[in-house]
Regions:
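Cytoplasmic/organellar membrane-interface segments at the starts of transmembrane helices
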Residues: 161, 346-354, 402, 406-494, ...
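Short aromatic-rich membrane-water interface segments that cap or initiate transmembrane helices
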Residues: 46-65, 181-194, 381-393, 471-479, ...
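Alpha-helical transmembrane segments and their membrane-interface junctions
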Residues: 362-377, 440-461, 541-567, 678-689
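Hydrophobic transmembrane alpha-helices and their helix-loop junctions in integral membrane proteins
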Residues: 76-117, 126-428, 562, 577, ...
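Flexible extramembrane loops and terminal tails that flank transmembrane helices
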Residues: 565, 572, 576-584, 593-596, ...
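Hydrophobic alpha-helical membrane-insertion segments
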Residues: 18-32, 155-164, 357-363, 435-453, ...
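Transmembrane helix-loop-helix hairpins at membrane boundaries of multipass inner-membrane proteins
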Residues: 2-96, 165-187, 191, 212, ...
C-alpha cells in the first residue's frame, strides 16, 4: 500500500493506463448502435489458414456487455491503484501486468473462434498468476498464486481438448458456425465435449469443488482483487458457459450439472461468507455466491433464466468492484480490515461510507438499486427451470445470507460507537474514492433507469448471442407476483440472520469444522504428486545410458506395436533365391550375436563391424553400390575410432541380472519385429514414383550429374547433407575433447 502523498515517477503509468482503458471503453461503446440493431462488428486476420485458424474477433451482445465492464471498471481500477500503491517501487511492473491482464480478458470475450479464445484464456491464467503473486517476497502470495494458476491451467488443458473435439464435431472452430450450425447434442462426441468444457469453465469460475483457490487469491493487492473478482477472470468461466449455451445447452446433462454445481457453490459460499471477520475474505466468498448463482441460472433454457444470468452478472460487477475498493480504502484509512476492530467510521470517512452503503444496498437486493431488479429476475428465472422448487430454495438461501453479509459490511464498520484502530481514521485520496463512488452511484442510476439504459443491450445478448426469441424486461416494479413474495421472504430471513449472526455461528461452526478442507486436500495432492515425480525420477533417471535407451525403445515398441495391431497392414513376403545373399544374412546375424555375447570390447567392435559390412553387401545386391560404398567407409571409420577409444577403456563386465537381460532382449525383439513388419508393409504398398521420376529426369539436366544418389545428396538436398555433416563433425569434436581430457587425467 502506498502513501498517497509521496511523489513517484511511476504514477503517470497508472494515469496513462486508466486513460487507455477509458479510450477502449469509448471504442467498444461506439459499437452499441450496430450491435443493438443486430449487426455484430467483426474483425479477422488469417493466422494459420491451412488449419482453418484465424485471429478473429467479434462484438455482439454478450461480448459487448463484458467488454464494457472490463474496460470501464478497468479504467477506474487503474486510477484506484495509482492512489493505493502509486509509490510502490515496482508500480510500473504492476501496471504492465494489470494492463496485460485486461487485454487478455478483452481478447477472450471478443474472440470469434475457439483457438483465439483459448489463447487468451491461457493468457489470463498467466497474467493473473503474476498479479496474485505480485508480492513475491511473501511465501503465502507465491503459494496462492501458484495454486490459482495450476487449478485454472489444469482446467485449461481440459478445455483445449474439448475445443479440439468440438472443432472436429462441428467441422471448424468458428464460433458463429458452431452456435448456429447443426446441434452438437446429436454428436457422439457431445458427452466428452461437455465434460471437458465444464471442467475448464468450473475451474476458471471457481465452482464447487474447485472453489477453494478463489478466497486464497486474496493474497493479491486490493486493486487486483477488485478487478479479478468483479468483472474479469472469475467471470471468464460463466462467459464461456453463456457463449456456448446455444451449442451445448438444453440437455439434461447440461441442466443438472450446472444447476447442482451452481446451487452448491452459492449456498456453501454464502454460509462461509457469514463466518469471515476479514472484509476482503467475506467479499471473496460473496463472489463465489454470485458465480454460483449465475452458473445455476445458465442451466435454464427459458429467456427469464438467461436474462437473470446476464443482468445479475452486471449487478455483481458494479457492486463487487465498488466494495473491494471500499475495503481497500478502509484498510488504507485505519490499518485493518477486521470487522470486530472497526466501528463509527462514517464520520471520518463519509464518502467511503456512502459508497459502501449504496453498494451494499445493491448487494442485498434492495430497491431502487439494480440489485433489486437482478434478484427479482433470479426468482422469475428459477421458477422456469427444471427442479424449480430446489433451485428457488437455493436462491432464497443464498440471497438471504447475502442480505445479512451486506448488513455486516455496510453497518458494522461505519456506524455505531467508534473503535480504536491502528491508524487514525482518515479518508482515502481522491483516486481511491472515484471508483467506488462512480460504481455505487451507477448501481443506483442503472436501477432507476434499467430498461432505457440496459434493456436493449441485455436484449441483444439474449437474442443475438444466446439465440433466444426475447428477453425479460428490466423494471423496478414488475407487479405483486411470486418473485416479489420471494423477495420479501429473503429480506425477512436475511434480517433475522443478521440479528442472530452470533447464534448462526454457534450452529454452523461445528459443521464447518467437520467438513473436509479442499484447500488442505490440494496441498496433500501436490505432496503426493511430488512424491510420485520423485519416484518416477528415481526409476527412470538412473544415470545409465542403457536404462534411457530401454525406456525410449520400450515406448517405440508399444507405439509401433499398436500401429501394427490396429492398422493390420498387408505384408508381401518374397524370399530371395540367392545362396550367397542368405550366407551374407547369416554372416551379419553372426556378427550381431558376437557383439552381444563377448566380454572383449575389440571383439564387440569386430562384431558390429561385421554387421555393417553385411549390410553393405546387401545394398550391393539391392543395386545400390554408392550406398554400399558409403556404408563401408562409415563402418571402417567407426571401427577405427571405436578401437582407439577401446584401448583406453576397461574390459566389459556383465552387471545385468538375468531378468534385466530378458527384458532388454524382449524390447529389442519387439522393436525389430515391428519395424520389419512396417517395412514389409511399405514395400507391399503401391509406390508413388513421382519424386523418383523427377530426380531421374532432372539430375543431369539441372545438376549435371549422372549418379542420381550423389546428386540428390549434394545438390537437391545439399542443406540436409550439410547439416548432417556438421552434426558428425561436432560429435567428433566432442569425442576428441573427452578422450584428450581422459588422457591428461591419466598422465
Amino acid at each position: 500500500m502506498a502513501d498517497s502523498t509521496a511523489p513517484d515517477i511511476s504514477r503517470p503509468f497508472g494515469y496513462t493506463a486508466s486513460i487507455l482503458a477509458a479510450l477502449i471503453l469509448v471504442g467498444i461503446a461506439l459499437t452499441v448502435p450496430a450491435v443493438v440493431d443486430g449487426r455484430p462488428v467483426l474483425f479477422a486476420l488469417d493466422w494459420a489458414p491451412s488449419l482453418g485458424i484465424s485471429l478473429a474477433f467479434m462484438v455482439d451482445g454478450l461480448s459487448l456487455i463484458f467488454g464494457l465492464l472490463i474496460s470501464g471498471i478497468g479504467s477506474l481500477i487503474f486510477l484506484y491503484a495509482t492512489g493505493y500503491m502509486g509509490n510502490h517501487p515496482q508500480f510500473g511492473r504492476f501496471v504492465l501486468f494489470l494492463f496485460a491482464f485486461m487485454v487478455s480478458m478483452l481478447g477472450l470475450v471478443l474472440a470469434r473462434d475457439l483457438i483465439t479464445l483459448f489463447l487468451f484464456w491461457e493468457l489470463t491464467s498467466i497474467t493473473s498468476y503474476l498479479l496474485i503473486g505480485f508480492d513475491h517476497n511473501n511465501p503465502r502470495a507465491r503459494r496462492n498464486a501458484l495454486q490459482a494458476m495450476l487449478v485454472t491451467a489444469g482446467g485449461g488443458l481440459a478445455l483445449l481438448a474439448g475445443f479440439i473435439l468440438m472443432g472436429t464435431a462441428a467441422g471448424g472452430y468458428d464460433l458463429a458456425e458452431i452456435l448456429t450450425g447443426p446441434g452438437l447434442q446429436d454428436s457422439s462426441l457431445y458427452g466428452p465435449i461437455l465434460v471437458l468444457v465444464l471442467l475448464g469453465a468450473f475451474t476458471k469460475s471457481a465452482q464447487f469443488p474447485f472453489h477453494f483457490w478463489l478466497p486464497n487469491a486474496m493474497a493479491a493487492p486490493t486493486p487486483v482483487s477488485a478487478y479479478l473478482h468483479s468483472a474479469t477472470m472469475v467471470k471468464a468461466g460463466v462467459y464461456l458457459l453463456a457463449r456456448l449455451h446455444p451449442a451445448l445447452g438444453g440437455t439434461m446433462a447440461w441442466s443438472v450439472t450446472l444447476a447442482t454445481a451452481g446451487a452448491v457453490t452459492a449456498v456453501l459460499a454464502s454460509v462461509l461468507a457469514m463466518r469471515q471477520s476479514d472484509l476482503k475474505q467475506a467479499l471473496a466468498y460473496t463472489t463465489l455466491m454470485a458465480l454460483g448463482t449465475i452458473t445455476m441460472l445458465l442451466a435454464g433454457a427459458h429467456p427469464y433464466a438467461l436474462t437473470a444470468a446476464v443482468t445479475f452478472l452486471i449487478v455483481h460487477s458494479l457492486y463487487k468492484a465498488s466494495l473491494f475498493m471500499v475495503v481497500g480504502a478502509v484498510d488504507h484509512g485505519t490499518g485493518t480490515r477486521k470487522v470486530e476492530r472497526l466501528g463509527g467510521l462514517g464520520r471520518a470517512m463519509p464518502v467511503t461510507a456512502a459508497a459502501a452503503v449504496l453498494a451494499c444496498l445493491s448487494m442485498a437486493g434492495l430497491p431502487p438499486m439494480i440489485g433489486w431488479i437482478g434478484k427479482e429476475l433470479i426468482y422469475a428465472g428459477a421458477a422456469t427451470m427444471t427442479g424449480a422448487p430446489l433451485v428457488i430454495a437455493a436462491a432464497v438461501t443464498a440471497n438471504a445470507l447475502m442480505f445479512a453479509v451486506a448488513g455486516v459490511i455496510a453497518l458494522r464498520p461505519f456506524f455505531g460507537a467508534p473503535i480504536a484502530t491502528p491508524h487514525v481514521p482518515h479518508e482515502a485520496p481522491w483516486q481511491m474514492l472515484a471508483g467506488p463512488a462512480v460504481l455505487a452511484l451507477g448501481g443506483l442510476v442503472v436501477g432507476v433507469l434499467a430498461q432505457p439504459l440496459l434493456g436493449s443491450v441485455v436484449g441483444s445478448a439474449l437474442t443475438g448471442s444466446l439465440l433466444q426469441d426475447r428477453a425479460a424486461g428490466l423494471h423496478l416494479w414488475a407487479g405483486f407476483n411470486e418473485a416479489f413474495v420471494l423477495s420479501m421472504l429473503t429480506f425477512a430471513i436475511g434480517a433475522m440472520l443478521y440479528a442472530m449472526r452470533d447464534r448462526f455461528a454457534t450452529l454452523v461452526d461445528p459443521v464447518l469444522r467437520r467438513m473436509p478442507s479442499l484447500d488442505a486436500g490440494w496441498d496433500s495432492f501436490l505432496d503426493w504428486f511430488r512424491d510420485l515425480a520423485a519416484w518416477q525420477t528415481r526409476m527412470l533417471q538412473t544415470g545409465r545410458l542403457t536404462a534411457y535407451l530401454m525406456a525410449v525403445f520400450a515406448v517405440v515398441a508399444v507405439a509401433l506395436g499398436a500401429t501394427v495391431i490396429l492398422g493390420r497392414p498387408e505384408i508381401a513376403l518374397e524370399f530371395p533365391r540367392s545362396t550367397f545373399l542368405w550366407l551374407t544374412v547369416g554372416f551379419t546375424a553372426a556378427g550381431a550375436v558376437v557383439a552381444l555375447n563377448t566380454h572383449s570390447r575389440i571383439a564387440a567392435i569386430a562384431g558390429i563391424g561385421t554387421v555393417g559390412i553385411g549390410v553393405a553387401v546387401i545394398f550391393i545386391f539391392a543395386g545400390a553400390p554408392d550406398v554400399a560404398t558409403t556404408q563401408l567407409m562409415v563402418e571402417t571409420l567407426s571401427a577405427v575410432m571405436f578401437a582407439i577409444a577401446a584401448l583406453r577403456l576397461p574390459g566389459l563386465v556383465e552387471r545385468r541380472s538375468r531378468q534385466r537381460q530378458l527384458a532388454h532382449g524382449a524390447v529389442a525383439l519387439a522393436v525389430g519385429l515391428c519395424v520389419t513388419v512396417m517395412v514389409l508393409s511399405v514395400t507391399a504398398s503401391p509406390l508413388d514414383r513421382t519424386i523418383t521420376q523427377y530426380f531421374e529426369e532432372n539430375s543431369y539436366v539441372l545438376a549435371h550429374g549422372l549418379n542420381i544418389v550423389n546428386v540428390v545428396l549434394v545438390d537437391f538436398r545439399a542443406f540436409d547433407t550439410f547439416g548432417e555433416l556438421i552434426v558428425v563433425l561436432l560429435a567428433s569434436f566432442g569425442a576428441y575433447a573427452v578422450l584428450k581430457r581422459k588422457g591428461r587425467a591419466g598422465a
